[in-house]
């Protein structure tokens, strides 16, 4: 998604991901909003987990931005929000090990997300899923459609 230099470059993103059963076939989706323009992204993985789909949605959304932006990224995944805002520094300091000394789960996608986030200024916001938020519900519908249609 392109932004014009010198103009407000705040992009609002809504992401969701899931699979059924977990693990199993999964889908992810992201909706990017910028100055009245919307872009929808979605994808499918035949064998995955909910957390991997949530991470993929956030990474893909940020990768779609063609220039550094100010971003408000809305996710209903506490795993994604806590990982990026609270846990990542410790993981990196411990060479991608968690507090128990075990390798961080989904390390490949966490690294992808960190790379995608590096050039942006991001406000990571958690929203309650399935609580009637129209954009969260829409992202959920797109992710479910991607999962169902493969």
Swiss-Prot record:
Binding site for Mg(2+) 1: 16, 54, 76
Oligomer status and interactors: Monomer.
Primary localization: cytoplasm
Molecular function terms, GO-annotated: magnesium ion binding; nucleic acid binding; RNA-DNA hybrid ribonuclease activity
RNase H type-1 domain residues: 7-148
Disulfide bonds: none
Function comment: Endonuclease that specifically degrades the RNA of RNA-DNA hybrids.
Pfam family, one: RNase_H
Enzyme class of the recorded protein, top EC level: hydrolase
Keyword Cytoplasm tagged: yes
Gene source species: Granulibacter bethesdensis (strain ATCC BAA-1260 / CGDNIH1)
Family membership noted in the UniProt record: Belongs to the RNase H family.
Superkingdom, natural source: Bacteria
E.C. number(s) listed in UniProt: 3.1.26.4
Subcellular location: Cytoplasm
Catalytic activity: Endonucleolytic cleavage to 5'-phosphomonoester
PANTHER family: RIBONUCLEASE H1
Protein name: Ribonuclease H
Cofactor note: Binds 1 Mg(2+) ion per subunit. May bind a second metal ion at a regulatory site, or after substrate binding.
Keywords: Cytoplasm, Endonuclease, Hydrolase, Magnesium, Metal-binding, Nuclease
An example Gene Ontology CC term for this record: cytoplasm
BP terms from Gene Ontology: DNA replication, removal of RNA primer
